[in-house]
Amino acid sequence: MIGWLEAMLRVGRKLFVKAETQLYPEEKPKLYPRSRGRIVLTRDPDGQERCVACNLCAVVCPVGCIDLTKAVADDGRWYPEHFRINFARCIFCGFCEEACPTSAIQLTPDFELGEWRRDALVYEKHDLLISGEGKVRGYRYWSVAGKAIDGKDKGEAEHESPPVDLRGLLP
């Protein structure tokens, strides 16, 4: 009988305390700076796509929700002909962002991806591309890469030494 009375007193005391429930759509939750949400593809400061279709993001993805195909532009740059992410399968782990050597793929704090149909959660390249540079400002991959493109040969990138002539090293 005393145990029952103690339990009722505990419940009675909590009865008049204000609840800590957040009313989600009206009150937005506090998001931390490193929170991981929707994936976007960013652009160079010049306005060109940063993605070089190296396929590292698709390889490192634990659920295999990224699909892309590489193409080569006239000036020698690589770009993704198609880039597709299935957000119905994505677990927002951030491995793709860490693996990207060009900082093209980035996770934003936007997490509201509710849809009525699953096929609406498959985003194509035109859905993922944003107009800005994202979190990494002023980075131009092709100006620091050791790959030859139109207007830049190997060894002419920023902070790059000229290539070594291996035949000149032979005795």
Curated annotation (Swiss-Prot):
UniProt: [4Fe-4S] cluster 2 binding residues = 61, 90, 93, 96
Q: Which is a Pfam family this sequence falls into? A: Fer4_7
Keyword annotations for this protein, in alphabetical order, are:
4Fe-4S, Cell inner membrane, Cell membrane, Iron, Iron-sulfur, Membrane, Metal-binding, NAD, Quinone, Repeat, Translocase, Ubiquinone
Cofactor annotation? [4Fe-4S] cluster
Q: Which SUPFAM superfamilies match?
A: 4Fe-4S ferredoxins (SSF54862)
Q: Give the CC-aspect GO terms.
A: plasma membrane
Which GO biological process annotations does it have? Answer: aerobic respiration
Reaction catalysed by this enzyme: a quinone + NADH + 5 H(+)(in) = a quinol + NAD(+) + 4 H(+)(out)
**Limits of the 4Fe-4S ferredoxin-type domain:** 39-71, 81-110
Where on the tree of life does the source sit, at the highest rank? Bacteria
Which positions does UniProt annotate for [4Fe-4S] cluster 1 binding? 51, 54, 57, 100
**InterPro entries from the entry?**
4Fe4S_Fe-S-bd, 4Fe4S_Fe_S_CS, NADH_quinone_OxRdtase_chainI
An example molecular function term from Gene Ontology annotations:
quinone binding
Q: Where are the transmembrane segments?
A: none
Compartments where found: Cell inner membrane
**Enzyme Commission designation:** 7.1.1.-
**What is the free-text note on the cofactor?**
Binds 2 [4Fe-4S] clusters per subunit.
Q: How does it sit in the membrane?
A: Peripheral membrane protein
The protein's job, in short, is: NDH-1 shuttles electrons from NADH, via FMN and iron-sulfur (Fe-S) centers, to quinones in the respiratory chain. The immediate electron acceptor for the enzyme in this species is believed to be ubiquinone. Couples the redox reaction to proton translocation (for every two electrons transferred, four hydrogen ions are translocated across the cytoplasmic membrane), and thus conserves the redox energy in a proton gradient.
- How does this polypeptide assemble, per the annotation? NDH-1 is composed of 14 different subunits. Subunits NuoA, H, J, K, L, M, N constitute the membrane sector of the complex.
Name recorded for this polypeptide: NADH-quinone oxidoreductase subunit I 1
| Gene expressing this chain | nuoI1
